[in-house]
Amino acid sequence: MENMEKVVYLDNAATTPCAPEALEMMVKALSGACGNPSSHYSVGYEAKEFVDTGRAQVAKAINASPAELFFTSCGSESDNWAVKGTAFTKARQNKKHLITSAFEHHAIMHSMAALERMGFEVTYIKPTSEGYIRPEDVEAAIRPDTALVSIMMANNEIGTIQPIKEIAEVAHKHGVWMHTDAVQAVGAIPVDVKELGVDMLSMSAHKFNGPNGMGALYCRKGVWPQNLIDGGSQEARHRAGTENVAGIAAMGKALEIATAHLDERMAHESELRDYVIDRVLKNIPEARLNGGRSPRLPNNVNISFPGLEGETILLDLDMHGICASTGSACNSDSLDPSHVLLSIGVPEEIGHGSMRFTFGPQNTMEEAKYLCDVLEEVIPRRRAMSCMWLQGQNTARQFSLKGEQ
């Protein structure tokens, strides 16, 4: 089998290539807006115009008011601000209990752990075996001193989409603020903050073909988590620091483009996703899909290959020019099994052999077929050299023979 002449990039959940239009806007802002957007003279006003335009574009994409949108450095900062800022605000009302899921992004998980060390209490809701959080489980966990419910909109590893609207309704019924980490959702599926009914929502530009180092936090009017960064009066006095003018301009343009063609993008990525899932599960023995098939992000495939280590598969794929991952890029240096897979009941030894493939609008059916061709060659060859796989097959054969006696 011959390698493709170009690199096949299938790790769009980790980061996405910057859209040419967004890059063009970034260069335009860098070369043309040399002033500080807080300054009261012509070049300062020019810089502020880039910021205002970017803010309006992002707000429109999620059906928010520009005044409800605050720029940050990334999705992780937005998550930290929403969780810790709410905790510090509500602690003044003696509300020191928070609710989240057991398979959130580490920006949420580690923020919650930090709050626990400060004396806050956190309830972690276990997802179903298919990777969904049930609103009734959230409601059962709410207490009189609950300050916040934070449930991600779409899981970054297995792609399952959560019933955020229903969970928000439960939270509000009990007077609790609702936050969702929508980093994987914004630009990938429709996101309407009014329809969802959330109080806060996190996003990150580099997940929808914008630049790295740009994020935002939506805060519904009247919802103010305590500042984490103090200093100047930027972002309506809620997030100090001179704005990243070029990053904001590029973020706005990228999201404008992503949402303008969202239906076509979703249909295209869903076709690639379903092709890979169906073919791999049919042709590779004991391959298993992690997470339910619906509702699921259009671009997400997460499959376990028992008997193998994901890192081994990753290296083989790289040799064939395919870029993929074994899970979250934010935890790629760790050899620990994925907390996401463990939370949905995937055994540790199977979780170690999991691969995540995530598509973007630039990917083609030819690339999806090439991925399957490579997997159908690599997996059997690696299993033939795997003591873990061969031992498991021998054990299964012995049980089968005993059953026939």
Residue ranges and their predicted role:
Residues M1-Q405:
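Pyridoxal 5′-phosphate
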